[in-house]
Structure formats: C-alpha cells, structure tokens
C-alpha cells in the first residue's frame, strides 16, 4: 500500500510539472521570437545548445509585463532572455557585484529601457526599487556564490522578501555527485543539488517543479564543468513563495 501511494504521488508530481510547463502555440511562437531576437549577441546563440532557452523560458513562468531579477547576471545571457520575455511593459534587473564589460556593452549596443543593470553585493542583491517581483533567476552561479564569504541564508531570505506571494525563484546549476555538499564548488564548479534545495527551502520557499531539460545522465559529474567533453548534468529547480 505504501509503495502504491508513493508511486501515485510521483505520478501526480509529474502531472503537475507537465501542467505547469505546457504551452499554447502562441506561447511557443513568443519564446521562439525571443530566442531569434536580433538584440541577442552571437555568444548567446553559441550558448543556446547547452542552455535550451525555448524550454528554460516556459519553465520560469515568465510573462510580458512581469518584474524580474537575474541574480549573478554574469555576461547577461539569462538577463537578456528575461528582459525580452517581460517586454517593454515589464522590467528586468540584472544584478552583479561588479558588472562586467560584456553585460554593460549589451545596453551600449542595444539600449533597452526595461533592462536595468544594478551593482549590488550578493548579501544584499535586491535594489530598493525592485519590490513585488514576479520571478527571480540564479543560473549556474549558486556554486560560485558558495565560494565567496556570502551569507546565503541572508541572500535567500532577501530574495524571498522581494517576491510577490506566488512568485518564483529559479535555480539552475551544474550537478555534483550526491552527498558531496559544497566540496566540489571550487574545484569542479559543481554543487550538490541537495544543498540548494535545503538552503532555499529554509528561507521559506516551496519546491514547485523540477525541470529535466538540462539533465544528462551520462555525465559522471567528476570533471570540471568547463572541461567536460559533453554537456554537464544540470538541475533546474523552480521554487515558489507561498500565497
């Protein structure tokens, strides 16, 4: 009986995830148009094969008019996608402690009023004007933050406070072997998925969905993410702030 209940619960979880990520033809066309936008740089397009943007975007639940924050924006790959997804009626804040040239050059080449770069520390990543957010992304950099003297509990709580009830926090990263914790964050640039789940839910978030679109079961997860001869196994987690 217990095994049957566990099996049914698993089926319900899969059904819920399928329902959350289902798209209409107009949604699919919108995401295709975002990925094809001439605003995106060549480096973005070369990265698409490893990032699967047409699957990532619906997973985030982003819609036009939303208020979004991309934490640890790096060169702006995710920030640009999200800025295009929220559109001119929305706003995307791209956070970085020290915004780099690739990120700032995007706006110099293609000014976008809804794409706002903010220099903020990870301990206090949310600018005062970025309240009532609909979605927050932290993509492939949670492991890097773990290498810094950053209070991740404080960071996640600040992100929780900045979101609207029902808002989403998306974390994607290179998967380390189960049980390794943060041991591989500096050497292999990977993190144990369980660490992220635990730290984020401690801030009050609830895990709503897991994405399989970046999974690679053939990855032994024992090589540096940048040196892997194939696409790394990545987890994609969507957390929600309860209503």
Stretches found by the model and what they are:
Residues 126-136:
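A short acidic, Gly/Pro-enriched loop at the edge of an enzyme's catalytic core
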Residues 134-153:
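A short SAM/SAH-binding and catalytic strip from SAM-dependent methyltransferases
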Residues 31-57:
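Class I SAM-dependent methyltransferase Rossmann-like catalytic core
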Residues 166-174:
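Conserved beta-strand signature within the Rossmann-like core of class I S-adenosyl-L-methionine
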Residues 17-19:
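C-terminal motif of bacterial Sec signal peptides marking the signal peptidase cleavage site
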Residues 65-74:
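Conserved class I S-adenosyl-L-methionine
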Residues 219-243:
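Core SAM-dependent methyltransferase catalytic element
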Residues 83, 152-165:
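A short glycine-rich, Lys/Arg-flanked "PGG" loop and its adjoining helix->strand segment in the class I
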């Amino acid at each position: 009986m217990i095994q049957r209940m566990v099996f049914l619960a698993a089926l319900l979880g899969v059904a819920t995830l399928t329902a959350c990520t289902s798209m209409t033809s107009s949604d699919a066309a919108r995401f295709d148009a975002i990925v094809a936008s001439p605003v995106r740089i060549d480096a973005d397009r070369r990265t698409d094969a490893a990032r699967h943007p047409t699957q990532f975007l619906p997973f985030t639940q982003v819609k036009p008019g939303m208020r979004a924050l991309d934490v640890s924006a790096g060169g702006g790959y995710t920030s640009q996608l999200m800025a295009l997804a929220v559109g001119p009626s929305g706003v995307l804040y791209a956070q970085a402690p020290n915004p780099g040239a690739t990120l700032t050059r995007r706006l110099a080449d293609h000014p976008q009023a809804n794409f706002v770069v903010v220099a903020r520390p990870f301990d206090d990543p949310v600018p005062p004007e970025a309240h009532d957010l609909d979605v927050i992304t932290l993509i492939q950099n949670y492991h890097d933050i773990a290498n810094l003297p950053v209070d991740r509990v404080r960071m996640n709580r600040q992100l929780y406070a900045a979101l609207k009830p029902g808002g989403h926090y998306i974390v994607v990263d290179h998967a380390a072997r189960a049980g390794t914790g943060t041991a591989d964050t500096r050497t292999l640039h990977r993190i144990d998925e369980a660490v992220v789940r635990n730290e984020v839910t401690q801030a009050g978030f609830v895990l709503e969905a897991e994405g399989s679109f970046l999974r690679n079961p053939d990855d032994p997860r024992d090589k540096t993410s940048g040196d892997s001869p194939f696409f790394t196994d990545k987890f994609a987690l969507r957390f929600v702030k309860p209503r």
